[in-house]
Amino acid sequence: MKKFLSILIVMLVTGLAVFANDQQEALNFFNSYVSAANSYSPTVATMYSPNAKIIRQVVKPDGTLVNVNTDTATYVKQMRLGQAGAKMRGYKNHYTNVTVTPMGNGAYKISSLRQPSGENYKLKTYMVVKKVNGSWKITEEMMQTKVQTFLRYAK
């Protein structure tokens, strides 16, 4: 019985260490995403799963929220178009209150508050990341925005 309990405890501790490692890896992936995005690196596009769920939650002037969903290919195309102007303006996002929550199945939800350059407000954001074929990918992303032009893509 002692041997069984010892083996069980070792397995539990090992499992927790692997879990903590993956959670830290997910956070490291998020930090590398922020760094790549703020330096306008083309690698940002490769950080998304080809079928990621992309949500832009538009905060209307009256405070109501409208979700605008898009596919990964369209989002990456829009992102590449916007990068040149953002780079010229020195636009960057600053993230605070970053938390990593396990969702099961190897997926982690990384939630944070995003403060755009030159603004004094913070907006909610989250991404769900998962290891796919050995590398971390964004499988879902929700980012609040006050940019009203996204509303024309709402369905």
Q: PLM features: residue spans?
A:
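Terminal "cap-and-tail" regions of soluble proteins that handle hydrophobic small molecules
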Residues: 23-32, 68-70, 76-87, 102, ...
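Sec-dependent N-terminal signal peptides
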Residues: 6-10
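Positively charged n-region of N-terminal signal peptides that target proteins for export
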Residues: 1-4
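Short, low-complexity N-terminal intrinsically disordered segments enriched in polar/charged residues
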Residues: 12, 16-46
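A short gly/proline-enriched turn/hairpin at secondary-structure junctions
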Residues: 53-69
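Short beta-strand edge/turn micro-motifs at domain boundaries
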Residues: 97-101, 107-111, 118-155
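Surface-exposed, charged secondary-structure patches
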Residues: 69-120
